[in-house]
Regions:
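A sequence-level detector of short, solvent-exposed, charge-rich linear segments
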Residues: 20, 89, 96, 126, ...
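Aromatic-rich carbohydrate-recognition surfaces in CAZymes
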Residues: 1-82, 100-114, 118
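Beta-strand segments within the central parallel beta-sheet cores of soluble alpha/beta enzyme folds
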Residues: 2, 64-71, 126-136, 185-188
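Well-ordered alpha-helical scaffold segments within catalytic/enzyme domains
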Residues: 45-61, 106-124, 165-179, 212-225, ...
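C-terminal ends of transmembrane alpha-helices
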Residues: 79-87, 143-146
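Terminal, non-catalytic domain-edge segments
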Residues: 232, 247, 252-283
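Alpha-helix capping and helix-loop boundary segments enriched in small/acidic/polar residues
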Residues: 33-41, 57-68, 84-105, 121-129, ...
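Extended ligand-binding clefts on enzyme/binding-domain cores
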Residues: 6-31, 35-41, 100-108, 135-231, ...
Length: 283
């Protein structure tokens, strides 16, 4: 899946300094068709997934083939990722949002991932620079996002909250960038703010996303807390009145399907399995 995005950028057909959202509409891979860019979102995705491949393979050979563009993308995130401008993230149905704390979290994880790749490729200077950068950004993120017993939806929006599921990669990839207290505080807040059929994405709506919530649940320290966050999703899947292939965007109050069905994002519900798999790989 990553090959096509790499080729699109490396060939010069994609001119922007961040990763493309797509390469076309099936069956034609003749250029991005999505109308709104997701600069930090997609650039972060490419770096994080390349890091995951390296850890799964036990080497960074794949990353080495694309090092020039990975470096360019990492520098881009270093410049704009701490406090993203008004742009879309993967929840594009919720619209644009500036200073998005969860999007910033993705940038931090991606920069840390690049640091890990550099370490695996015996590039100590780059490894030290980007790993330390990610750690500084994490501390700054905590300062800007702190809202008492949780962290904000956006840095400039006190009294708000959102799932920070992008931080799951610190645990899954073994990056060790975040202070432990960040995930602990977030998960404790999630457990107190669930609805009958799951945890809303943020305070603006009562919508839920199956894949995102499993990522958030995977951040939990204990199996009990993980199960507590998963149980309402199981209830949604079993009790939804919408008899369709699994809908990943749904209403947490009544289990009604909102939109999206049988999509590839359902693969995200296997995050806990990926966590176990990569944890064993790192031993």
């Amino acid at each position: 899946m990553l090959d096509f995005i790499f080729d699109y950028s490396e060939s010069g057909r994609w001119k922007k300094p961040f990763a493309a959202h797509d390469v076309g509409t099936y069956p034609l891979a003749n250029g991005q068709t999505y109308q709104g860019d997701m600069p930090v979102e997609e650039t972060g995705n490419m770096l994080i997934m390349t890091t995951a491949i390296a850890i799964a393979d036990g080497n960074a050979d794949y990353a080495a083939k694309h090092w020039e563009i990975l470096t360019a993308w990492s520098n881009y995130l270093a410049e704009v990722g701490m406090d993203p401008e008004n742009q879309l993230c993967t929840e594009d149905f919720a619209g644009h949002l500036a200073h998005n704390a969860n999007l910033s979290a993705k940038a931090i994880m991606a920069i840390a991932g690049y640091g890990r790749l550099a370490e695996m490729l015996n590039k100590p200077k780059e490894a030290k620079k980007f790993t330390e950068m990610a750690k500084r950004m994490a501390i700054e993120w905590e300062r800007r996002a702190d809202d008492g017993d949780h962290y904000r939806l956006a840095f400039d929006m006190p009294g708000t909250w959102s799932q920070k599921y992008n931080f799951v990669w610190d645990k899954v990839l073994g990056l060790d960038i975040l202070p432990d207290r960040i995930m602990k505080k977030e998960v404790a807040f999630y457990l107190k703010n669930q609805n009958k059929y799951g945890l809303p994405l943020d305070n603006r709506f009562t919508w839920g996303k199956t894949d995102d919530t499993v990522w958030s649940a995977t951040m939990a320290d204990s199996e009990g807390d993980f199960q507590e966050l998963i149980r309402p999703i199981w209830k949604y899947v079993n009790e939804t009145p919408s008899r369709i292939p699994l809908g990943d965007w749904y209403e947490t109050l009544n289990a009604d399907y909102i939109n999206f069905r049988a999509r590839s994002v359902v693969g995200g519900v296997f995050m806990k399995s990926l966590d176990h798999y990569l944890r064993n790989k790192r031993k």
